[in-house]
Amino acid sequence: MAIPESANKTSILLESGTNELEIIEFTVADETFGINVAKVREIMVAQAVKPMPNSHHVVEGVFKPRDEIITVISLAKYLGLPECENSGRDIFVVTHFNNLSFAFHVHTVVGIDRISWTAIKKPDKAVYGGQDGAATGIAEFQGRLITILDFEKIIAEISPESSIQVEAIEKMGERHTMEKTILVAEDSMLLSKLIIECLHKAGYKNTIKTDNGQEAWDYLLEAKESGDPIKDHVACIVSDIEMPLMDGHRLTKLVKEDLVLKKIPLILFSSLISEEMRIKGKQLGADEQISKPEIGKLVSLIDKLTENH
């Protein structure tokens, strides 16, 4: 079934920067997980797939529900959890982000929960694998804990060519070192590392890494309160949209409503940049919006927006 429009109010919530989202809650081997509704295109009963030779061990194969061939990923295998004994009732969660479609094989779908990003906490690195962890947040909802998985990291591991490529910066040719400081807000450990690496290679050696919108906002407030010209602290902000504690839309709203901070160019760099999301970002004041993994285009936009800073 497609995600009902009446159920998917994420667009309404994000339009005003209310810092809320809706997640689809699902289970794998009785463990509870979540994914942002905005990433999900359809939920359907699991069906037969065509195995692909020499594919990643968590790839079950491909199927063609309509006019598109979609790769199916076993979340049980990826997470090291047992397969369901009664697989006839399993579910495919069909996603679309980063301009790519994948189906994630799960065991049950519980429902759709509306939740505030403030209720989603950063996972403990010691428990969830540090730099290699598969979780971006832990949500508490109605007395139960839901693990928000880093689906972008999962896809990047299975299909590295679909993720951010450092080679894209090398193709831009020789570049000079810039003194300007770039503030990055990104909750995925893997993507944050890749973005910073690419910015450094592009000549932006001064970067500030934050794991979510709240950390970025706290830094901006400190910079503002210092009394120094704000451009001495931050020349440009690059922010994801999906982040625990405070999302990128809420961060954009706060920055662009502040008389001092609104002068800082802000780029939304997210896997969720659809036409609908682009309208919302523009309404909230984002200077530019670009879909992952177009890192070369991101660097070009930073160049353009910081020309006079």
Q: Model-derived features: where do they sit?
A:
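An acidic, low-aromatic, low-complexity terminal/linker signal
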Residues: 1-237, 241-249, 262, 271-309
